Regions:
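Hydrophobic anchor at the beta1->P-loop junction of P-loop NTPases
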Residues: 108
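ATP-binding Walker
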Residues: 114
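ATP-dependent small-molecule kinase phosphotransfer cores
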Residues: 130-183, 187-191
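Conserved phosphate-donor/acceptor-positioning beta-strand/loop module used by diverse small-molecule
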Residues: 193-210
Length: 210
C-alpha cells in the first residue's frame, strides 16, 4: 500500500513538473515571437531613417531605454539577469543596423598609433561589429609574439600569414579588420582587402606616431 501511495505521489510531482515545463515552453514561444517582431521593427526603423534622412546614431534613445528598464525593474527579482538579456537584445539590434549599413568589411590600415584600435573599439561599441586584429590573431595562432615570429621564422613567413588571414576573411562580412602597419605593402594583400571590404587609411602626425 505504501509503495502504491509513494508511486502516486511521485507521479503527481512529475505531472506538476511537466505542467511547469509546458508553461516555460509557452513563455519561450512568446519571447521568440516578440524578438522576431522586434527585429522586424528595427529593420523598419532603419528604412525610415534612410528615407527621411534621420541620423542613424541616436544614443539618447538607447539612454531612454536603459532608464525605462531601470524603472520597470525596481524592487523586482532577477534584476541583473533581466538587464543582461536586454543588453544582449540591444547588442543584436546594433548588429542588425550594422548589416544594413555595411554589407561589407571595414578594413583599417595605417601606421601604428594612427588610431586603428580606437576606431575599431568605437565601431564595436556603436554597431556591435566583430573586430579582427590581424597581429593579435597571428600571434595567438603561432603561440608567440610578432617579434618572436620574425626572429624564429622570418618576415616572409609573417607576411604570408597576413595574406592567408586576409584570404580567410573573405568568408566574413560586416566585420572590422585592423591590419598591421606593413600589411598594405603587398599588392596582393590590397587586392584581398578590396574584394569584400572598404579600405580606410588612417593618418596621423609624425609626432603622434613616433
Amino acid at each position: 500500500m505504501r509503495t502504491s501511495t509513494h508511486k502516486s505521489g511521485k507521479d503527481k510531482n512529475m505531472n506538476q513538473l511537466e505542467v511547469l515545463r509546458e508553461s516555460l515552453g509557452q513563455c519561450d514561444e512568446i519571447i521568440l515571437d516578440a524578438l522576431l517582431m522586434r527585429n522586424r521593427i528595427v529593420e523598419d526603423i532603419m528604412v525610415y531613417k534612410e528615407a527621411n534622412n534621420v541620423p542613424i546614431l541616436q544614443p539618447e534613445q538607447e539612454a531612454k531605454q536603459k532608464e525605462w528598464l531601470e524603472r520597470r525593474m525596481q524592487e523586482k527579482r532577477h534584476k541583473n539577469e533581466v538587464a543582461d538579456v536586454f543588453e544582449s537584445i540591444t547588442r543584436n539590434s546594433k548588429k542588425i543596423q550594422a548589416r544594413k549599413l555595411f554589407n561589407y568589411n571595414i578594413v583599417l590600415i595605417g601606421f601604428m598609433g594612427a588610431g586603428k584600435s580606437t576606431i575599431s573599439d568605437y565601431l564595436k561599441t556603436v554597431f556591435a561589429m566583430d573586430i579582427i586584429e590581424m597581429d593579435q590573431i597571428i600571434a595567438e595562432r603561432a603561440g608567440m609574439s610578432i617579434s618572436d615570429i620574425f626572429e624564429t621564422y622570418g618576415e616572409q613567413y609573417f607576411r604570408d600569414c597576413e595574406t592567408n588571414l586576409l584570404i580567410e576573411m573573405q568568408s566574413r562580412t560586416n566585420v572590422v579588420i585592423s591590419c598591421g602597419g606593413g600589411t598594405p605593402m603587398r599588392e596582393c594583400n590590397v587586392a584581398e582587402m578590396k574584394k569584400n571590404g572598404r579600405v580606410v587609411l588612417l593618418t596621423a602626425k609624425p609626432e603622434t606616431i613616433l
